[in-house]
A protein has these predicted regions:
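Zn-dependent metallo-beta-lactamase
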Residues: 1-25
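Acidic, His/Gly-rich catalytic cores of divalent-metal-dependent hydrolytic chemistry
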Residues: 5, 34-38, 157-160
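Short, solvent-exposed loop/turn motifs
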Residues: 10, 25-27, 131, 136
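Short loop/edge segments at beta-strand edges and connector loops
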Residues: 15, 107, 139
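Conserved beta-strand elements of the Class I
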Residues: 20, 27-29, 136, 147
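Core catalytic region of metal-dependent phosphoesterases/phosphodiesterases
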Residues: 27-29, 36-131
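Catalytic metal-binding/acid-base residues of hydrolase active sites
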Residues: 33, 78, 110-111, 142-143, ...
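Conserved beta-sheet core of the metallophosphoesterase superfamily
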Residues: 124-160
């Protein structure tokens, strides 16, 4: 685990691809791309099944290990919302519903038309950018704030 001091905030970069903010008991991550494998398979691209389950299990484990109370997804919660099936939504709802955290999302470029899916899964949707504890949270890294944490480039922290 790598400790990062960013402005007046202190984070831990975790091996599970999350950024942990212990003072607020918040996990930040980006680019889950739920449904990516199924979308590729629907398009005739042979990719193995189960990737999203692994990603959600990794997130669940991170929540349990840190005792997080809040999770922020910094964009691309979904890969291609028009191809999301009822079966996928049922599976994701079952995986996420047992986690006792507040879920927040800033919708990314892959999340067009994702609003109803995100709210069904219990996510609070926030605009891009959103100011959180003096740090701009965004999906795209091109906003002009001094301190920002962004996804999109899987992921990045930019120091100015």
């Amino acid at each position: 685990m790598q400790i990062i001091e960013f402005g007046e905030q202190r984070f831990s970069a975790r091996a599970d691809r999350t950024l942990w903010h212990p003072d607020s008991r918040t996990l930040l991550l980006s680019d889950l791309h739920l449904g990516k494998g199924a979308h590729f398979r629907q398009s005739g691209i042979p990719v193995p099944d189960g990737g999203e389950t692994d990603d959600l299990n990794r997130l669940s484990n991170a929540i349990t290990e840190t005792n997080a109370t809040s999770v922020w997804i910094l964009g691309d919660l979904f890969h291609h919302p028009p191809s999301i099936t009822d079966a996928q939504m049922d599976r994701w709802t079952n995986q996420l519903s047992g986690l006792k955290v507040q879920f927040h999302v800033i919708l990314g470029n892959h999340d067009r038309n994702a609003h109803p899916f995100a709210t069904t899964l219990g996510f609070h949707i926030h605009p891009e950018p959103t100011l959180w504890r003096g740090i701009e949270l965004a999906h795209h890294p091109d906003h002009g704030f001094e301190a920002r944490i962004a996804g999109h480039v899987h992921p990045q922290i930019e120091f100015k």
